[in-house]
Regions:
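Alpha-helical transmembrane segments and their helix-helix packing motifs
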Residues: 1-265
Length: 265
């Protein structure tokens, strides 16, 4: 009996990632930069749109922002960018299935994470040179969401992060399994919309929102927007996202499919 579709796709993904990383770390870095950049693009536009909509119907921006943000994930999926939180699923599953050594998987994951942040910082800097970000309101959508996130305890951040990356990797698995392009887009949008609407903690999404604020003078008006607090938040979110996407989705699906059975993915 041949390997399941899931195992074949995870193996191919791990081989592709490791091959590019070994042959050209610069090119792998650029693909990772694109992922952070794409999410920052959609975050910035979503935040501006949410503030505008809130002026007409207070509170309604929370419904619009997740929809616009979710397109950033669609871009990176179709344009082959490297996202840390989806790599948590691929590389954890690949390690369990012996498609990649755990040391190499961890190295690639950390490398990808760093350059996701670099991509977010680059696009955030560019946006902060535009008129749309010339007068960011400390009571506006982006600043309010960021400040609320940075007030959370480690325990709350952890559970929010676990849930976020379950949603994200539901989107990734849907993208892997479905052949119809429209179905891929709709399923990805639905899963991403849900975690963003719930303001769950997603590392790359936080890279985007915190970076946009870091280049803006409004950050000085946010009491919890401090370097060490942001670093704490990133660290807890990274681990939580790995548990949600890497263990509860990646490892679970790898285990489910690591058997000779008619019932596999």
């Amino acid at each position: 009996m041949s390997e399941s579709n899931f195992i074949q796709k995870v193996g191919a993904a791990c081989n592709k990632k490791e091959d590019l990383y070994q042959k050209s770390k610069t090119r792998y870095a650029v693909r990772s930069i694109f992922a952070g950049g794409f999410l920052t693009l959609s975050t910035a536009v979503g935040a501006v749109a949410a503030d505008l909509l809130n002026t007409f119907v207070p509170g309604s921006g929370r419904f619009l922002f997740p929809f616009i943000f979710a397109w950033g994930l669609v871009y990176l999926l179709f344009l082959n960018a490297e996202l840390t939180t989806s790599n948590m699923m691929y590389l954890t599953a690949g390690t369990y299935l012996k498609k990649i050594h755990w040391k190499k998987a961890l190295e690639i994951l950390l490398y990808c994470t760093f350059f996701n942040l670099i991509g977010a910082l680059i696009v955030a800097f560019l946006f902060n040179q535009t008129t749309a970000f010339a007068h960011v309101d400390p009571k506006g959508f982006l600043a309010t969401v960021a400040e609320n996130k940075l007030q959370r305890s480690n325990q709350v951040v952890f559970f929010e992060g676990v849930i976020a990356n379950i949603f994200v990797n539901i989107a990734i698995l849907s993208y892997l399994y479905f052949k119809d392009e429209t179905a891929k887009v709709l399923l990805a949008l639905s899963a991403i919309y849900m975690f963003v609407f719930m303001t769950n903690e997603h590392l790359a999404a936080n890279f985007a929102s915190f970076s946009l604020l870091s280049f803006n003078s409004v950050s000085s008006q946010l009491p919890h927007f401090e370097f060490l607090n942001i670093l704490r938040h990133y660290s807890v979110t990274f681990f939580a996202n790995w548990v949600g996407g890497g263990v509860l989705i990646g490892l679970a699906y790898a285990w489910l499919n690591n058997i000779k059975s008619l019932y596999n993915d």
